[in-house]
Amino acid sequence: MAVLAYNLGKREINQYFSIKNAKLLAAAAVVLLTVFHAASRHYGSSDTCDWLLSSGRFLGDNVWQPYGCMLHKYKSTEAKFCLREKRIAFVGDSRIRQLFYSFIKMMNPEVKEVGNKHENIPFVDGDSTVNFLWYAEVNNSLKEQLMLWTEGSASKPHVIIIGAATWSIKLHNGKSEALFQYKANLTAIADTLEKLAEHSEVYWVLQDPVYEDVLSESRKMITNEQINLYNEAAVSTLNTSKKKVKFLEASRQAAMETISQSVDGLHLPESTRDVGAMVLMNSMCNKILKPIDGSCCQSAPPLSVLQKLAAAVLLVSVVCFVLLGFSSHRKSRPAPDVESGEEKKHPAAVGQLNPKGPLLAIGKMSLIMLYFYLCDRADIFMKEQKFYTHSAFFIPLIYIFVLGVFYSENSKETKLLNREQTDEWKGWMQLVILIYHISGASAFIPVYMHVRVLVAAYLFQTGYGHFSFFWLKGDFGLYRVCQVLFRLNFLVVVLCLVMDRPYQFYYFVPLVTFWFAVIYATMALWPQILQKQANGSAFWNLALLLKLLGLLLFIGFFAYSQELFEGIFSVWPLSKLFELQGSIHEWWFRWKLDRFAVVNGMLFAFIYLLLQKYQLLSEGKGEPLFSNKISNCLLFVSVVSFMTYSIWASGCKNKSECNEMHPYISVILAFILIRNIPGYARSLYSSFFAWFGKISLELFICQYHIWLAADTKGILVLIPGNPTLNIIVSTFIFVCVAHEISQITNDLAQVAIPKESGPLLKRLLGAGVFLVLVLTLSQKD
């Protein structure tokens, strides 16, 4: 009865909320959000530098998140490179001196705070000069120093960081006359600061709050009320300058949350001072170094030649899409299946496809690529950095697994690793990887090591699936190869052109493509051994095992010959495909990390198909895979193996050391046995996970730009100020886009890859010319 009610309820929901309706809702949300953010940028503050300097919040201990953009954590080498041949002056009181020390420690962490309290402090590092000038009050002495810089009689700094107020409050006991004099003195230097701002960067540091409870008697008059009055005076006076002196307010906001940790109530704890220093460094250097994880103070990058050509093609496609109209969209496609929400497969031959179909598909793909560009290249949407907490990873993990169990259904097949089960496997792994990426869980080594197993499991499935196909069907035709390569690479090739990223940037697709080529070569080259050939002959089975052993030795040889490996892949045109930032090292690292996973998948497929052929497995519904004794034994060993691996991974302290062990330690086989030995487990699958499994490749690639941001370094912000709602909305749009791209890829594959040899060879020749042209243009770029 409960099952009937569940099925009726599911049918009722799908009648009103089909996949098509979900996509229409997602498209409407994209349009509204784009208009909202574009209008906010146009009519409001569109400068991310203003956001960086003015506001933010703590994500966790000492992790500062500016409003709407990402803060890059500068290393010493980066800071030195950015500030080479620059003169920087910190002007003010003891609080500015603290900021000065935090700033120069980013250039040289070994610096000690040993300068005299009320004197100037010089700092020279190579050809960079950073000086602290002691001016505790805004007075004539300060005005004279600023005048020297404007008149050119003293070397003018490239950057001036200035601020003072607490001494004025202290010396005049917080009297109102002192505030009036402070305003007058600020007015007197406002024009001078304006002139300096014409050729230098000038920052006025707003006063941080104090912790009144622990202030000494001599500082009791420095209250937060007084601090606020002096800050208001500074803003109202200096805001009138045409060049608009920049206000550093972010450190003040950070101090509001941490001032209670102050020892004397006046000076900030070092971690809070570091926030102000890092904000300043981002403001000065992001536009120079353009770090991908530092989106503050960066404008949209200029279009490359390839991007301009891609934009022209996509624009023509969009025009065709609009002209054809939505009414003619896939007339031959039947209505969606109410039960599953998926469109039913049309039985018509490929040759009967409506010629408008490919144009409509390309038009939709063009609009989707426009959304990708707006999300992660144009200066429209906000971005925030990741911050790992255990709850951010494990709570969503528990939630999706509860959903997965809730949507358990009887599988149509009960064979080991049947299609529904492999889709389920890919689905839950992909969801875990998505949560892993958005939560920044790579910072937690035990989670990182478990996710490494999931990536290896994808490659294991690659070996298992393609070996099984070639072994059973013996189809080594060009059509099959082109179909696989097109489905794997179509989205990535388009993204490389639109997002101006190298092929290796989307590392998983090059990895899977490479291993598919290896599997194909292993199975297709002489001696070509197939199941029908090996039937009844142990010799051919042994020959295939020797072939796999040869592949294993080949892999081992390259794994221990890094120079040879890098030498081969550094030759053009392979270098253009596998290099990242001019180096082949990333490809070497990715390849080496899971080098045995594909061979393990091939070997497992061979052994399984052999056992199946000789009827040594019980794959009936509800039956254990082996006899009860063997099944229980294998289950026990598998569970112990799983637990042992988890304990080992939890004890990992160093990523590089654990990565060295990773290729030799695998629990993939243990998982397969646990999932398949019990008959009841093999008879069920999660339709929830299986649905995501069918679009797992698209989900993995699309996350780079429309769910995460800054090429996976940050998080896309569609709904500012509400992280939970933002994740819900961006995830909904992201999944709908991935599903649509999957359908577009499948549709275009039928048209782009004809079965006839003649047309197929012509298109391959065209694809080759296109590839050479793209590689040549990218080299010139």
Swiss-Prot record:
Membrane topology (UniProt): Multi-pass membrane protein
Q: Tell me the Gene Ontology biological-process terms attached to this UniProt entry.
A: carbohydrate metabolic process
Name the catalysed reactions: CMP-N-acetyl-beta-neuraminate + acetyl-CoA = CMP-N-acetyl-9-O-acetyl-beta-neuraminate + CoA; a ganglioside GD3 (d18:1(4E)) + acetyl-CoA = a ganglioside Ac-O-7-GD3(d18:1(4E)) + CoA; CMP-N-acetyl-beta-neuraminate + acetyl-CoA = CMP-N-acetyl-7-O-acetyl-beta-neuraminate + CoA
Q: What Pfam family is a match, any one?
A: Cas1_AcylT
Membrane topology (Cytoplasmic) = 1-15, 330-354, 408-430, 474-477, 526-537, 617-629, 682-687, 736-756
Report TM segments.
Answer: 16-36, 309-329, 355-375, 387-407, 431-451, 453-473, 478-498, 505-525, 538-558, 596-616, 630-650, 661-681, 688-708, 715-735, 757-777
Recorded protein name is N-acetylneuraminate (7)9-O-acetyltransferase
